């Protein structure tokens, strides 16, 4: 019966560290994936012909 109490005590001390490490690794991996996607999209925008014209609004001509 003493072995079960030792395993329960170990697991109760182990799980908060495990969840903390798991959260940190998931956040770091998501940041890495998002930065890679941003870099790929920037490279694709460099090869786009209409990249410089996307944010320009058409100007209306005023007839005088």
Curated annotation (Swiss-Prot):
BP terms from Gene Ontology: symbiont-mediated activation of host apoptosis; symbiont-mediated suppression of host apoptosis
Q: Where is this region: Interaction with host BCAP31?
A: 6-15
Q: Which GO terms describe its cellular component?
A: host cell endoplasmic reticulum membrane; host cell Golgi membrane; host cell plasma membrane; plasma membrane; virion membrane
Stretches assigned to the Intravirion side: 1-20
Site positions for Involved in opening and closing mechanism of the pentameric structure, renumbered to this chain? 22, 51
Q: Which GO terms describe its molecular function?
A: identical protein binding; monoatomic cation channel activity
Protein function: Viroporin that forms a homopentameric ion channel displaying low ion selectivity. May play a role in virus morphogenesis and pathogenicity at various stages of the viral life cycle. Accumulates at the membrane of the Golgi apparatus in infected cells and may facilitate virus release by modifying the secretory pathway. May enhance host membrane permeability and disrupt cellular ion homeostasis, which can be sensed as damage-associated molecular patterns/danger signals, triggering NLRP3 inflammasome activation and inflammatory immune response.
* Family the UniProt entry places it in: Belongs to the orthopneumovirus small hydrophobic protein family.
Q: What is this protein called?
A: Small hydrophobic protein
Q: Which organism is it from?
A: Human respiratory syncytial virus A (strain A2)
Taxonomy of the source species: Viruses, Riboviria, Orthornavirae, Negarnaviricota, Haploviricotina
